[in-house]
């Protein structure tokens, strides 16, 4: 831990034992929220789980921020999800929004991260902006 500025543990979207273990060892969490209807239901369950982990296993755990993913500006649903979360969640919300992007969807099937699969894609550029935002926040 002393040798790195950041250690990222990318967990599956399900609240599994792996996710609980990651929360137990982490200092903070970045919560990705898909701009989809069911993501809002999952968010309340995730917040509840984080609170339980804070109470029982890791009192220092904090939510670093929330990032919107799979955002599609052409849909009212994406706009509504963003508005709903901003109105109801008292957390840091990153300015960077990760758009729905075909290259992002393709990259895992080629076993590559987006910054190697298509570094000039909108998705790759968005994740680079998010990384810069996270790093900058960590320096504050």
Predicted regions mapped to residue ranges:
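Conserved catalytic-core segment of NTP-binding enzymes
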Residues: 1-102
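Hydrophobic "lid"/C-terminal helical patch
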Residues: 130-134
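Generic C-terminal helix-cap and adjacent flexible tail
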Residues: 135-140
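C-terminal boundary of histidine-terminating zinc-finger modules
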Residues: 107-129
